[in-house]
C-alpha cells in the first residue's frame, strides 16, 4: 500500500531521535495524516505477509472490542496479543471495548446543575447497579441511520481518570464516522503509532470496522482517514540506538531512493546483531524494496453487527510477500 510506504519514508526523512517509556529508542515525527480509499480494495498490506495468524488475531481483537468485554479471558482462546498487559485473572487496566460499549455516565446525584446528560432512555444501568453507561457503538449506528449528515458520529476510548494511571491507555483513542455523497467514511486519531507493528493492524482493523458499520447502516464504504500524533519507528537500544542518534541525517537518504545502500550500511555499521528485532528500520527498508500488489477484498455475512462471528468475515484474493519480523516494545 503506497500510503503506508510513504509513511515510512517520511518518518525516516523527517523524524527526530526520541527516547520513551519502553527503553527502546525511536525515530519519531509529529502529526502525520493520510487517507486510504476503501473503494479500491481492503487495505491489508501486501509487502509483508498478514494473513494466517496475523489476520486471525486482528479479526478476533476487533470482535472482542465490539463485545464490550473488559477482560481477555475469551480473547485468549484465539490470540495472545493482549496477554502482556493483563493481570493473572485476565483483567485489563484499560479495555477499548469497555469504553466503546459501556462508557460511564454519572448518576444524577453526581451531575452538576445546568449540565446536559443522556436520559434513562439513552443509557443503561450496569447489572450491579453501581453505574450507568452509554453504548457508543449503538449510538453512532442509530445516529447514522437517523441523521447521516450529523458531524457527531464520535466514539472515544479515552477516559481521563482511567488514562492518567493506566499501564497502557488507549493508543487509537477516538474515531469519527462521517457521511459524504452517501458513503461512510471513518477518521481515526491515534496518539501513539508504532509504524512497523501497530499501524498495519490499526489500518486493517478500522477498515474492517468501517465495513461492518457500513453494512449495518446500508451504505457503501468511502475513505479511511488516519491522524498519527506521534508516529514512530523503533531503532533499538543502547549502542545501536546511539548510532542512530549520531547518524540520523543518513536516514534521509531513503527519500532519494538509496534504500538498498542505506540498508546495507546499517547492517554493516550499526552496533549489535539485532537478534531481538527491536531495531525495526532494516526490515522496514526491506519492505520498501518490495512493490505493493493489488489489494484483497473481504466478504461479510449478512448479519447484524453484534451477531458477527469470526467465520462470517472472509479475506479474498490476498497476494503478499514474505513475512518480516519486528520485536514488540512493551
Question: Which role fits each region the language model picked out?
Answer:
Residues 1-330:
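Terminal, non-catalytic protein-protein interaction segments that mediate quaternary/complex assembly
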